[in-house]
């Protein structure tokens, strides 16, 4: 085939016009070394350039030796960094179990796509740039384009999947996270790759058979069906602009929702701090109050007295019915705590129970103290509604098992003068006073016959109060940790999206410009823009390391060959955790 012009095509879009061969003055070579289109006919049938007198073209494609060295060195370094970085991501996912989360499964898929680009696409495109022609044949050309487009589109699809996953995790934490499993993540990743393959591979590989001929000239490599500017424009919109728009909107929604949750958590922490500083002992008809520290001091001053009064301590199940029905429902299983502020009715009236029924919060416990000359009530710290309070299922399952044991142990403790049981009873516990039993018999009748009797000191009452505050702090801590994880995931997503937009936008802008002006953009800009798209695969592992400490430490461990040391540290850590667990187990049973 003979050409008499100086137009060529980009490997991505065939309608790009630019200089295929440099002139001698541009290349800095002596005249006659490089073939010029204006004076020579170029035969590309065998992949060689020849002039009428039989001289062959420069094998460097019109570049100087130093230009070739610079291009090969720069692109080779980028390809090597891309390969090493994404291999580190894959190996890190394999060796570190902490990285095997649903979020990181999507990053693993993205790393696989980037690795393909680093191994195949970057090197073949560098060869194309240096030689200024495609010398590997039509089959290799079609395979390169198919792999390149499938991997690039899979990267975009994976970014979309990550964005939707983050969005639903933030906006629908209860419904979506229950369905968010590794199996479902694998299905979504598989769909991303299948869709990318179906969209591009058959059309690139078999288009010449669909239309009956191959229109790509020898020595060139581009997608045959992208020969029209309108088709090129449409593919750019579908492959880049639409996904970027969707991802930007989703990330904005994620950012707003995260900010909203941050404010809610700050309010919850503030209310928890206020609850800790509140006075929780209120004498009837008096403004006197005392803190847990004061209770301890009183307990120390009365060390010669074993029993200070009457204390009611119980955990009950979910109930919004009057107090008479609450006692019946105390023996049923449930998944939440009860609003048992109605214990105040033991000292006041039944009307207070009805007022507490409609309250928005629920208490863990209520303690009623009867001291000589005083009538005091210890009200527990309020917790959020039971719909928002998560109680471990194993604790709920212990209710029926411990019910009989609690009764027997409580009765034995009274007879033998034993200490408080190791675990708080799930039943109402009524504590008899050694000071004034007769005066408090009316309270006993209001609690019911199912209660047991045990001595309880002020110190134990203080521990009960601390238990309630600790429970609240644990809830806040879990919410805070969850929010921190969501923020880290959002930061990783933002870094990946930002890198994607920065590296892909220049090339796709040139695509739009080329639709209206096919000779306005030099070939050098096209090559730089296309290579910039590849650099996105180089930057992604850096984003993982910068935004995720676990990735960063695992990368460091692998690069420094500290795998054995890591295993030893892990074993030592597990041993320490085991010791800590065995030490805390008896304390948690109290």
Swiss-Prot record:
Phosphoserine is found on 385
In the record, biological process GO terms are: acetylcholine receptor signaling pathway; adenylate cyclase-inhibiting G protein-coupled acetylcholine receptor signaling pathway; calcium-mediated signaling; chemical synaptic transmission; G protein-coupled acetylcholine receptor signaling pathway; G protein-coupled receptor signaling pathway; G protein-coupled receptor signaling pathway, coupled to cyclic nucleotide second messenger; ligand-gated ion channel signaling pathway
Q: Which family does it belong to?
A: Belongs to the G-protein coupled receptor 1 family. Muscarinic acetylcholine receptor subfamily. CHRM3 sub-subfamily.
**CDD domains in UniProt:** 7tmA_mAChR_M3 (cd15299)
Q: Where is this region: Disordered?
A: 323-357
Q: Which GO terms describe its cellular component?
A: basal plasma membrane; basolateral plasma membrane; dendrite; endoplasmic reticulum membrane; plasma membrane; postsynaptic membrane; synapse
What would be an example GO MF term here? phosphatidylinositol-4,5-bisphosphate phospholipase C activity
Basolateral sorting signal (motif): residue ranges? 275-281
Topological domains on the Extracellular side lie at 1-67, 131-142, 207-229, 515-526
Span-the-membrane segments of this chain are 68-91, 105-130, 143-164, 185-206, 230-252, 492-514, 527-546
The cross-references to Pfam families, in alphabetical order and at most eight, read:
7tm_1
**According to the UniProt topology, which residue ranges lie Cytoplasmic?**
92-104, 165-184, 253-491, 547-590
Summarize the protein's role: The muscarinic acetylcholine receptor mediates various cellular responses, including inhibition of adenylate cyclase, breakdown of phosphoinositides and modulation of potassium channels through the action of G proteins. Primary transducing effect is Pi turnover.
* Keywords (A to Z) from UniProt: Cell membrane, Disulfide bond, Endoplasmic reticulum, G-protein coupled receptor, Glycoprotein, Membrane, Phosphoprotein, Postsynaptic cell membrane, Receptor, Synapse, Transducer, Transmembrane, Transmembrane helix
Instruction: Tell me the SMART domains matching this sequence.
Output: 7TM_GPCR_Srsx
Q: List the disulfide bonds.
A: 141-221, 517-520
Origin, by domain of life? Answer: Eukaryota
Please state the pathology the record ties to this protein.
Prune belly syndrome: A syndrome characterized by thin abdominal musculature with overlying lax skin, cryptorchism, megacystis with disorganized detrusor muscle, and urinary tract abnormalities.
Q: How does it sit in the membrane?
A: Multi-pass membrane protein
Compositional bias, Low complexity, is annotated for: 334-345
Summarize the impact of residue 276 to A. Answer: Loss of basolateral sorting
Q: Does the keyword Iron apply?
A: no
Q: Where is this chain's protein located in or outside the cell?
A: Cell membrane; Postsynaptic cell membrane; Basolateral cell membrane; Endoplasmic reticulum membrane
* The name this protein goes by in its record: Muscarinic acetylcholine receptor M3
Per the record's keyword annotation, is Cell wall biogenesis/degradation included, yes or no? no
Task: Describe its partners and assembly state.
Answer: Homodimer; the dimers can form tetramers. Interacts with NALCN. Interacts with TMEM147.
């Amino acid at each position: 085939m003979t050409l008499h012009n100086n137009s060529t095509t980009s490997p991505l879009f065939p309608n790009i016009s630019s200089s295929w061969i440099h002139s001698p003055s541009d290349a800095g070579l002596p005249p006659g070394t490089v073939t010029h289109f204006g004076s020579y006919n170029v035969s590309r049938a065998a992949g060689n350039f020849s002039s009428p007198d039989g001289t062959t073209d420069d094998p460097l494609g019109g570049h100087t030796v130093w230009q070739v060295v610079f291009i090969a060195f720069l692109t080779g370094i980028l390809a090597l960094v891309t390969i090493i970085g994404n291999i580190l991501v894959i190996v890190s996912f394999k060796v570190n179990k902490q990285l095997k989360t649903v979020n990181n499964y999507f990053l693993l898929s993205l790393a696989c796509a980037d690795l393909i680009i680093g191994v195949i696409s970057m090197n073949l495109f560098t060869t194309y740039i240096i030689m200024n022609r495609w010398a590997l044949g039509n089959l290799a050309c079609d395979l390169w384009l198919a792999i390149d487009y499938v991997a690039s589109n899979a990267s975009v699809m994976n970014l979309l999947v990550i964005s939707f996953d983050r969005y639903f995790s933030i906006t629908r934490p209860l419904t979506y996270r229950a369905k968010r499993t590794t199996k479902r993540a694998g299905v979504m990743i598989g769909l991303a790759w299948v869709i990318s393959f179906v969209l591009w591979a058959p059309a690139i590989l078999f288009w010449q058979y669909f239309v009956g001929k191959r229109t790509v000239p020898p020595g060139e490599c581009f997608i045959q069906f992208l020969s029209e500017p309108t088709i090129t424009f449409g593919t750019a919109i579908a492959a880049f602009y639409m996904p970027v728009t969707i991802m930007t909107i989703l990330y904005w929604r994620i950012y707003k929702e995260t900010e909203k949750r941050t404010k809610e958590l700050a309010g919850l922490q503030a209310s928890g701090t206020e609850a800790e500083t509140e006075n929780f002992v209120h004498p009837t008809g008096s403004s006197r109050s005392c803190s847990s520290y004061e209770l301890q001091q009183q307990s120390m001053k009365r060390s010669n007295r074993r029993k200070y009064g009457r204390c009611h301590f119980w955990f009950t199940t979910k109930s919004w019915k009057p107090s008479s029905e609450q006692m019946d429902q105390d023996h049923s299983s449930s998944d939440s705590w009860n609003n048992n502020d109605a214990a105040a009715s033991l000292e006041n009236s039944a009307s207070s129970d009805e007022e507490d029924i409609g309250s928005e919060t629920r208490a863990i416990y209520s303690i009623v103290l009867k001291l000589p000359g005083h009538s005091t009530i210890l009200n527990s710290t309020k917790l959020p509604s039971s719909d928002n309070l998560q109680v471990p299922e194993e604790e709920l399952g212990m209710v029926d098992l411990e019910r009989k044991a609690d009764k027997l142990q409580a009765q034995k403790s009274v007879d033998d003068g034993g200490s408080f049981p190791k675990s708080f009873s799930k039943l109402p516990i009524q504590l008899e006073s050694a000071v004034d039993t007769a005066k408090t018999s009316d309270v006993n009748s209001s609690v019911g016959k199912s209660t047991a009797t045990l001595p309880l000191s002020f110190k134990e009452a203080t521990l009960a109060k601390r238990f309630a505050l600790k429970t609240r702090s644990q809830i806040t801590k879990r919410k805070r940790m969850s929010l921190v994880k969501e923020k880290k995931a959002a930061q990783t997503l933002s870094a990946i999206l930002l890198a994607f937009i920065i590296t892909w936008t220049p090339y796709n802008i040139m695509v739009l410009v080329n639709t209206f002006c096919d000779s306005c953009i030099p070939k050098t800009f096209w090559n730089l823009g296309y290579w910039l798209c590849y650099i996105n695969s180089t930057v992604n592992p850096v984003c993982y390391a910068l935004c995720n400490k676990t990735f960063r430490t695992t990368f460091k461990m692998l690069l420094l060959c500290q795998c054995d040391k890591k295993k030893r540290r892990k074993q030592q850590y597990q041993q320490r955790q085991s010791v800590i667990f065995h030490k805390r187990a008896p304390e948690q049973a109290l």
